[in-house]
Amino acid sequence: MSRAYDLVVIGAGSGGLEAGWNAASLHKKRVAVIDLQKHHGPPHYAALGGTCVNVGCVPKKLMVTGANYMDTIRESAGFGWELDRESVRPNWKALIAAKNKAVSGINDSYEGMFADTEGLTFHQGFGALQDNHTVLVRESADPNSAVLETLDTEYILLATGSWPQHLGIEGDDLCITSNEAFYLDEAPKRALCVGGGYISIEFAGIFNAYKARGGQVDLAYRGDMILRGFDSELRKQLTEQLRANGINVRTHENPAKVTKNADGTRHVVFESGAEADYDVVMLAIGRVPRSQTLQLDKAGVEVAKNGAIKVDAYSKTNVDNIYAIGDVTDRVMLTPVAINEGAAFVDTVFANKPRATDHTKVACAVFSIPPMGVCGYVEEDAAKKYDQVAVYESSFTPLMHNISGSTYKKFMVRIVTNHADGEVLGVHMLGDSSPEIIQSVAICLKMGAKISDFYNTIGVHPTSAEELCSMRTPAYFYQKGKRVEKIDSNL
């Protein structure tokens, strides 16, 4: 039988839009895309472009860029700029207004895409399954809410993303998440960022730059070191630099209770027994797949305990015509990954060219101050897979910071290789421009570059990136999973 649509996509994020546009434009398919609203902001925050465009990568990068001017202004004196720093004031409202305008422009461009693409239509509401070929567009997340539309389709693509987690403690409702942080009326003078991941660290940097004078930013993390899963030496160095910038990093610390003071501020009691007052408590303790309102049981779609939709290498669920991509599958929660998965889905289903996204050697960045850029294995994981692993490392003060007054800003580079053949397994960097540098490095890793390819390449001088071309001697090794100073050829 002929169905009304070839494809219904639930979720207008980066992955969903990539799949929808490719299917309609490249393969002339009839595609419906469902999401909660067209433009960013409350009440739903999700809108055209998904988390990345509306309450994620894009606005965050703009705000971090603004925050970096704090150091630029301070450091300019070392380069001969005479500024009256007492007269320099951050304007949070101006930042948010500019950010909102930029994001609205992207929302508008996506609206234009729907208007200009034959066969591609947008449907506003909550998407939910009725069966494996029928999608309901509901008025709200309530499964009993009014049905606005019923869409009959051959294929279904689930691309609903992820959502910030809450702590589940008393006073949880008095805290905000990154969603609300993008729309605060004013920068908090006293802020607590809860969590040791990249979102918490990035917002700590933003709040630290825009806070009123005399303010304080605390970052509380229950573990012993921030950024679990990243290179351990970079984590240590970043912590030192965050503290040098004035951020109070509190490890082995977690809120136990939050109450509201008479003046509207928040009183936090920590698990350690310590207490403090804040204007804003922002939770950034992780994100969970957003699948709860999809009524997946109606079509028999399998999910993991955390709500992640189970898929195979080609993003297909256990139901033959239903696929899922992006954060909702809890594979690699990065926008470019979701985009690649969306394109691969269309290649597989509509182009008859089955393609699985390669989730290895994916570069990523932490837009902390200073930023981090990484790609590939950390040394501990490499040592579990390879018999002999070599670790190269370098830490230095970039040229500019010899006169900027920020000599504490070290640039750190660490390279992990398979010592048996020299293949570069991972590159990890901390310092200015790391996110830009790591993109080129990722191409090298994808091509199977060896450490000799790095040091036989002539560097660009004077840059921090040229250090990648100067690292010839390993600092230490791993052999049979154990760290050693040199390789024992008898083992």
Curated annotation (Swiss-Prot):
<dbReference type="InterPro" id="IPR004099">
    <property type="entry name" value="Pyr_nucl-diS_OxRdtase_dimer"/>
</dbReference>
<protein>
    <recommendedName>
        <fullName>Trypanothione reductase</fullName>
        <ecNumber>1.8.1.12</ecNumber>
    </recommendedName>
</protein>
<keyword id="KW-0560">Oxidoreductase</keyword>
<keyword id="KW-1015">Disulfide bond</keyword>
<dbReference type="InterPro" id="IPR036188">
    <property type="entry name" value="FAD/NAD-bd_sf"/>
</dbReference>
<feature type="disulfide bond" description="Redox-active">
    <location>
        <begin position="52"/>
        <end position="57"/>
    </location>
</feature>
<keyword id="KW-0274">FAD</keyword>
<dbReference type="GO" id="GO:0004362">
    <property type="term" value="F:glutathione-disulfide reductase (NADPH) activity"/>
</dbReference>
<dbReference type="Pfam" id="PF02852">
    <property type="entry name" value="Pyr_redox_dim"/>
</dbReference>
<feature type="active site" description="Proton acceptor">
    <location>
        <position position="461"/>
    </location>
</feature>
<dbReference type="GO" id="GO:0050660">
    <property type="term" value="F:flavin adenine dinucleotide binding"/>
</dbReference>
<dbReference type="GO" id="GO:0005829">
    <property type="term" value="C:cytosol"/>
</dbReference>
<dbReference type="InterPro" id="IPR001864">
    <property type="entry name" value="Trypnth_redctse"/>
</dbReference>
<dbReference type="InterPro" id="IPR001100">
    <property type="entry name" value="Pyr_nuc-diS_OxRdtase"/>
</dbReference>
<keyword id="KW-0521">NADP</keyword>
<feature type="binding site">
    <location>
        <begin position="35"/>
        <end position="51"/>
    </location>
    <ligand>
        <name>FAD</name>
    </ligand>
</feature>
<dbReference type="GO" id="GO:0005739">
    <property type="term" value="C:mitochondrion"/>
</dbReference>
<comment type="similarity">
    <text>Belongs to the class-I pyridine nucleotide-disulfide oxidoreductase family.</text>
</comment>
<keyword id="KW-0676">Redox-active center</keyword>
<keyword id="KW-0963">Cytoplasm</keyword>
<keyword id="KW-0285">Flavoprotein</keyword>
<dbReference type="GO" id="GO:0034599">
    <property type="term" value="P:cellular response to oxidative stress"/>
</dbReference>
<dbReference type="GO" id="GO:0006749">
    <property type="term" value="P:glutathione metabolic process"/>
</dbReference>
<comment type="subunit">
    <text>Homodimer.</text>
</comment>
<dbReference type="InterPro" id="IPR046952">
    <property type="entry name" value="GSHR/TRXR-like"/>
</dbReference>
<dbReference type="GO" id="GO:0045454">
    <property type="term" value="P:cell redox homeostasis"/>
</dbReference>
<dbReference type="InterPro" id="IPR012999">
    <property type="entry name" value="Pyr_OxRdtase_I_AS"/>
</dbReference>
<dbReference type="Pfam" id="PF07992">
    <property type="entry name" value="Pyr_redox_2"/>
</dbReference>
<dbReference type="InterPro" id="IPR016156">
    <property type="entry name" value="FAD/NAD-linked_Rdtase_dimer_sf"/>
</dbReference>
<comment type="function">
    <text>Trypanothione is the parasite analog of glutathione; this enzyme is the equivalent of glutathione reductase.</text>
</comment>
<dbReference type="GO" id="GO:0015042">
    <property type="term" value="F:trypanothione-disulfide reductase (NADPH) activity"/>
</dbReference>
<dbReference type="InterPro" id="IPR023753">
    <property type="entry name" value="FAD/NAD-binding_dom"/>
</dbReference>
